[in-house]
């Protein structure tokens, strides 16, 4: 199934009040209170010499078109000195024994009977694909060279074939599923513990911070051919594989920029009242060598560049900067390896008016990418 990486959100947009707040940082202490109505003070708050003292969020209004209500995500990084280097993609289906071992772990995770005949065949590009498919229950496992997917029928409906639409819907408004609601069969905290435990059993290193989505009766099906009265209530966790405490890029990577096809770089683990119902493993990589260790720019420099750009080039449509995130981006080279470099990614929303017989406002989810060492912007085609 094709993964849709570019998300268009349809929401009514309103600017958020910019009253001063206090921010709690990773060690549990409180960062200095900042006058959040003052853009210059916001920049100063992001120019901390110690990366662990950065606030978790900043707010201000820049002008009548541009506001900031931004998370500051440094993930598990502990220093402004960050490595770059080369990595090689792990081939899940290259070694038959390792492939079967992974299949057994996935079968155990979603409680499938693995004592069946496993089919294998070659894809068009020559890579081996291993399939376990129960035609009666419609549960399945598929292991390809660059990814693996295990899903029960209920999990496939809840996560893939619904309005949540992890893969299908270009208008998937995932934010409405980011709630504090607790489902009856398990608390969100217990569900997260199970997700973290499962990632460890699969030997996948992920950042401590996860994204949780709660799917309930609002998560209706988007395909009429599926006939069911009720969707199972489901917790869905997006977990971010990392290297040196920094996740692989979470933005929809551009093939013209990176040299390889778009991929979503998050591990998806979903669970309903029966247990884990959906498990999607993204491409993973082995670190081959370190080519550079350098000091990255502070987020204040990146935010300043982004604000200057948005003020200069964007003349219509309200804009809200929502996140500044330190991530690793991969660039394909000629030797079946990838150059991996630290980047700052700025995520923002922009309102766009769609005119016609029934005009409406469309909220676009956009992003810009900057070299974390130099501040040079990578041009996204």
Model-derived features: where do they sit?
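Activation/maturation switch segments at domain boundaries
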Residues: 24-29, 328-381
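Short, exposed beta-strand "edge-strand" segments with a Pro/Gly-rich flavor and a Y/T-containing core
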Residues: 65, 81-92, 287-304, 318, ...
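A short, surface-exposed beta-strand/turn
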Residues: 141-166, 248-281, 354-381
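Sec-dependent N-terminal signal peptides of Gram-positive bacterial secreted proteins and lipoproteins
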Residues: 1-24
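Preferential activation on post-signal-peptide N-terminal prodomains/segments
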Residues: 18-258
């Amino acid at each position: 199934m094709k993964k849709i990486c570019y998300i268009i959100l349809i929401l009514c947009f309103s600017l958020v009040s910019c009253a001063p707040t206090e921010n709690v940082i990773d060690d549990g202490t409180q960062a200095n209170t900042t006058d959040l109505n003052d853009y210059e003070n916001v920049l100063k708050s992001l120019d901390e010499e110690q990366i662990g003292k950065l606030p978790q969020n900043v707010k201000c209004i820049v002008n009548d078109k541009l506001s900031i209500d931004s998370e500051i995500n440094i993930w598990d990084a502990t220093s402004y000195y960050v490595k770059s280097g080369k990595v090689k993609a792990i081939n899940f289906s290259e070694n038959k024994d390792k492939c079967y071992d992974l299949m057994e772990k996935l079968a155990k995770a979603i409680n499938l009977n693995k004592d069946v005949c496993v089919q294998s065949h070659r894809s068009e590009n020559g890579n081996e694909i291993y399939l376990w498919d129960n035609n009666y229950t419609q549960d399945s496992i598929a292991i390809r060279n660059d990814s693996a997917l295990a899903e029960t029928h209920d999990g496939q409906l809840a996560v893939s074939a619904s309005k949540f639409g992890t893969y299908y819907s270009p208008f998937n408004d995932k934010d409405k599923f980011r709630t504090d609601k607790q489902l009856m069969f398990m608390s969100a905290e217990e569900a997260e513990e199970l997700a973290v435990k499962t990632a460890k059993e699969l030997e996948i290193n992920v950042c401590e911070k996860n994204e949780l989505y709660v799917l309930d009766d609002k998560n209706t099906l988007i395909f009429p051919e599926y006939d069911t009265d009720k969707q199972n209530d489901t917790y869905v966790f997006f977990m971010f594989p990392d290297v040196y405490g920094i996740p692989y890029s979470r933005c929809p990577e551009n093939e013209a920029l990176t040299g390889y096809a778009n991929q979503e770089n998050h591990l998806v683990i979903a669970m309903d009242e029966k247990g884990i119902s959906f498990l999607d493993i993204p491409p993973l990589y082995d670190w081959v060598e370190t080519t550079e260790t350098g000091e990255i720019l502070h987020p204040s420099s990146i935010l300043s560049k982004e604000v200057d750009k948005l003020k200069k080039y964007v003349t219509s449509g309200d804009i809200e900067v929502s996140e500044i995130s330190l991530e690793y981006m991969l660039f394909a080279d000629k030797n079946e390896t990838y150059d991996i470099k630290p980047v700052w990614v700025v995520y923002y929303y922009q309102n766009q008016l769609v005119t016609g017989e029934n005009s409406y406002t469309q909220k676009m989810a956009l992003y810009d990418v900057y070299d974390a060492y130099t501040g040079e912007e990578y041009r996204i085609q």
